[in-house]
A protein has these predicted regions:
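Terminal targeting signals and extreme-terminal segments of soluble enzymes
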Residues: 1-139
Length: 139
């Protein structure tokens, strides 16, 4: 039987080509917040057979950046620091979900943290800082 995120209330996200290269991202609104997810495949595996940590970090960077972007009133943001603590291995075929939150936002910086999970199992804890890019006055 094939896993279908849409059957669980997830909807496919439109995104730019870079994050979609790791797979179609999914989004779901819960408790006045968004969650994001992607379905891992054999192409994401490292030589040991687990999903490569870089794949998980790329997904976390992109989706936590969405939280920062929303907190910055949709002004462009760039990652200036991101810390990842791996807690458990992810197996190809796992559906990886990210739950995130903005912990602080200033005019120029947004602080975000999140948990990557497979079902009830936390697999990584991430925190980071995003710089808000604002147009500079000309003249």
């Amino acid at each position: 039987m094939t896993f279908d995120p849409a059957a669980l209330g997830w909807r496919a996200m439109r995104t730019n080509p870079m994050p979609s290269s790791i797979g179609l991202p999914w989004a779901k609104r819960t408790d006045n917040n968004w969650q994001y997810a992607f379905l891992t495949t054999n192409e994401h595996a490292n030589p040991q057979g687990a999903v490569h940590g870089g794949i998980l970090m790329t997904f976390a960077d992109h989706t936590l950046g969405i939280y920062a972007w929303e907190a910055a009133q949709r002004a462009p943001c760039v990652t200036i620091q991101m810390n990842t603590h791996f807690l458990a291995a992810v197996t190809p075929g796992d559906f990886v979900e990210l739950r995130g939150e903005v912990t602080r936002a200033t005019r120029g910086l947004v602080f975000v943290r999140g948990i990557l999970a497979v079902g009830d199992k936390d697999v990584a804890a991430i925190d980071g800082i995003w710089r808000v890019l604002r147009a500079r006055p000309t003249g």
